[in-house]
Amino acid sequence: KDIFPNYKGHRKNDRDKSKIDWDKLFTITNTIKQELIDHFPFKVIEVPKCECDDVVGVLTKYITNNPDYNVQDGLIESNQPILICSSDNDFRQLNYPNVQQFSVHQKGMIERVTDVELLLLEKSIRGEASDGIPNVLSDDDSLINKKRQKSIYQTWIDPILEFRTIPNDIKEKVERNRTLIDFERIPKEISDSIIQSFLESK
């Protein structure tokens, strides 16, 4: 939200319109979280200003690049296998050889991408409606105010993706969206906090 105030801003609007008792739900969630900490052998990570996908993105990279987590199979040492259980397409950018993603909705593994840079460029142009990130042709408040977004036609976006040349009039919005979507752009202080929480959790 420091970068884009409307980021996931629809959540509050949706909660306000919902009949769910959110205070009670949050109380139950906190109770379950504490029970996981107290009684189960799972690491529970909670860091201010962090979304779940930030935690997954940072820790996937950290564990993959840290030899302390490597596994030994005879004489062969390899990276710790990681399985991400989520249907969120943002995790497809975590295209490490040791990482797989299982979609609960599709009941199967999500196909790997062959070009992460191309994936991120297209996502930055198209935006991510579920996260309140509008496409680069639409107003910043399109999603939070439920305004119709301008259409992005394949004939318009194909040359940009093919030549990877971003028109000047959308560069600023592409850059903003990329910062919101790309795990490599998570601020260092947040990444460090996630790793510290991971190392300190039992």
For each of these PLM feature ranges, what is it?
Residues K1-K12:
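Non-catalytic, usually N-terminal nucleic-acid engagement modules in DNA/RNA processing proteins
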Residues K12-S201:
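Extended two-metal-dependent nuclease catalytic cores across DNA- and RNA-processing enzymes
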